[in-house]
């Protein structure tokens, strides 16, 4: 598994802009944004995690979310997201094709809290999540694209919407999730950004005699 530090560009990369404009016209795609957690949960809460299951199912080690887990995640996590950092891509019939979800990194808040919620650790987390006192780093929590739309440039449309948001909120770089070293599809997303591959995880097996 590898992870990347991805620097937020000063402007949307030209190729991203061209591809996103082309793809949006060619497939009649729509960019959807929400300001209400209740509304996005009603309209697309279930669909977001069903899309995640569909897009991630071929990946080694992925276990599909159960209906109970999906219900829990919709209830617990959507309300704490800054919806400016959530972008949905739909077709002309409003069917969900892609989603990009990111949030401010909680690493700095957890360090200040020394990994504890009590007595005052909760304050540092609440300041980041609810008071919008954001650090310089954001976490790319989830990027999922319907399999039949992968490798067609839909990711460029997601980031063409999100990059200006990241700039507006003062983020300087993003942290990717752990990625399989051989997952060329996801790593191709970062081709047009300045990146550092700064973390690597390995598992080793040794027989016991």
At which residue positions do the language-model features occur?
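Conserved acetyl-CoA-binding loop of GNAT-fold acetyltransferases
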Residues: 1, 189-200
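Acyl-donor-binding surface of acyltransferase catalytic domains
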Residues: 1-35, 204-208
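Conserved beta-strand-loop-alpha-helix junction that forms the acyl-donor binding cleft
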Residues: 5-8, 145-150, 176-186
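A conserved beta-strand-loop-helix scaffold within acyl/acetyltransferase catalytic domains
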Residues: 33-145
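Low-complexity, glycine/alanine/valine/leucine- and proline-rich hydrophobic stretches
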Residues: 116-129, 157-166, 176
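Conserved acetyl-CoA-binding loop-helix of GNAT-fold acetyltransferases
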Residues: 125, 137, 141-145, 150-164, ...
């Amino acid at each position: 598994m590898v992870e990347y530090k991805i620097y937020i560009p000063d402007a949307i990369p030209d190729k991203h802009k061209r591809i996103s404009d082309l793809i949006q016209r060619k497939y009649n795609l729509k960019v959807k944004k929400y300001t209400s957690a209740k509304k996005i949960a009603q309209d697309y809460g279930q669909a977001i995690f069903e899309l995640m299951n569909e897009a991630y199912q071929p990946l080694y080690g992925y276990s599909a979310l159960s209906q109970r887990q999906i219900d829990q995640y919709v209830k617990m996590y959507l309300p704490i997201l800054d919806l400016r950092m959530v972008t949905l891509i739909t077709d002309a019939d409003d069917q969900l094709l892609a989603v990009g979800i990111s949030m401010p990194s909680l690493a700095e808040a957890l360090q200040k809290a020394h990994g504890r919620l009590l007595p005052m650790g909760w304050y540092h987390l609440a300041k980041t999540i609810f008071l919008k006192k954001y650090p310089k780093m954001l976490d790319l929590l989830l990027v999922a694209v319907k399999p039949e739309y992968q490798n067609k440039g839909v990711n460029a449309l997601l980031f063409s919407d999100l990059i200006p948001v990241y700039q507006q909120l003062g983020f300087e770089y993003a942290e990717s999730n752990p990625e399989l070293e051989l997952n060329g599809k996801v790593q191709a997303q970062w081709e047009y950004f300045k990146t550092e591959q700064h973390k690597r995880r390995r598992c080793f097996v040794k027989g016991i005699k």
